[in-house]
Amino acid sequence: MNTLGRLFRVTTWGESHGPALGAVVDGCPAGLPLSEDDVQRELDRRRPGQSGVSTPRSERDRVEILSGVHEGRTLGTPISMIVWNEDVDSSKYEPIRTRPRPGHADVTYRWKYGHVDYRGGGRASGRTTVGIVMGGAVAKKLLREAPSNDPLGIEIVGHVVRVGSVEADPGDLSAEEIMQYAESNPVRCADPDAAEEMLGEIERARENGDSVGGTIEVIAENVPPGLGDPVFGRLDGELAGALMNIPAVKAVEVGSGVRCSEMHGSEHNDPIWWDGHPVVDGDNSGGVLGGISHGGRLVVRVHVKPTPSVSVPQRTVDLESEEEVEIEVEGRHDPCICPRAVPVAESVVAIVLADAVLRAGYVNPDSVELPAASVEDRWRTLKRHL
């Protein structure tokens, strides 16, 4: 599957060393202000070669919007976007054509397809997240500015909270504060002291020809209540499943996550108070109860494995000779992918939420200028069942 979403659908395409990568967004309502600059801002945050902790591959990642937008507004038709690859060097990959790299999808793609594009990981490469970020840029715009008469104002921000053994403690910050601090350093960590230690951890891995993993936290503020469905359509389940589709992600937590197994119920339960309607206060639930959003801020954590491309000798096999061999991976790779994966994780959360607000009726699926339900309208209607 190359498509995420039901009403708001994002289809991505392209390979790491192909001529281009792209995305098609289908189901975005008409009337949403959208420009190439809106998408470019997000792509620039993901772009390679932007700091000493990322791959030296230098790509401008200049987006072109080919359809679905006229005079600066969406048409309600498919939005097609493209980014051309400009700095492709496939020479380092010929030696591994028949030697699957440990930790990569080389061997599993061979099992499934037989004929594969082995250059840079092909379709399995992190490079393909360009399409996710393009789709996420449209989703973020929708969540922030729709509907036109009463925008939801949903803000989504991510930051790195762990690299290797270094864990951040940014304290209780708003989404705006997290963005401000995280975007001020190359690690995208909102804790300045931890950011310095993380840089050291990444540099040590690079010097050893190795890599290091980490954890990204994504927070969404102003998420309305009622998103998601019971049992198999749970919002937290959809978020976890979608985030697990990001290359290198190995685990997802919602709210307190695995820490909840160490807690008592009296400690874990977030209290409820009244503000014209019931409000759940706290992050243990992560913004979701029973698979449905309760109106509090949404909190998820994404655990990212170390980049598998390392120059440390590793054991593999040669598929032609059928002999066991030793391999050292060459090429241009990130010693830690977490800083550039932050906008990718944000984008996936945005796409899932954009789909959910359309399904819940908070945004009219035809046009952002048409009437849609508000939180207050929803509560006035539903409380009649008390």
UniProtKB/Swiss-Prot annotation:
Reactions performed catalytically: 5-O-(1-carboxyvinyl)-3-phosphoshikimate = chorismate + phosphate
Keywords: Amino-acid biosynthesis, Aromatic amino acid biosynthesis, FAD, Flavoprotein, FMN, Lyase, NADP
Binding positions (NADP(+)): 46
InterPro entries with a match to the protein in the record: Chorismate_synth, Chorismate_synth_AroC_sf, Chorismate_synthase_CS
Cofactor binding note: Reduced FMN (FMNH(2)).
Necessary cofactors: FMNH2
An MF annotation (GO) of this entry: chorismate synthase activity
Region feature Disordered, mapped onto this chain: 32-60
Binding-site residues, FMN: 123-125, 290, 305-309, 332
Database matches in PROSITE patterns: CHORISMATE_SYNTHASE_1, CHORISMATE_SYNTHASE_2, CHORISMATE_SYNTHASE_3
Known pathway: Metabolic intermediate biosynthesis; chorismate biosynthesis; chorismate from D-erythrose 4-phosphate and phosphoenolpyruvate: step 7/7
UniProt key word Cell cycle: no
GO biological process: amino acid biosynthetic process; aromatic amino acid family biosynthetic process; chorismate biosynthetic process
Entry's EC annotation: 4.2.3.5
Domain of life: Archaea
Segments of skewed composition (Basic and acidic residues): 38-47
Gene Ontology annotations for the cellular component aspect, listed alphabetically: cytosol
Enzyme class: lyase
Purpose of the protein: This reaction introduces a second double bond into the aromatic ring system.
NCBIfam families cross-referenced by the UniProt entry: aroC (TIGR00033), PRK05382.1 (NF003793)
PANTHER family in the cross-refs: CHORISMATE SYNTHASE (PTHR21085:SF0)
Similarity comment: Belongs to the chorismate synthase family.
Protein name listed in UniProt: Chorismate synthase
Gene expressing this chain: aroC
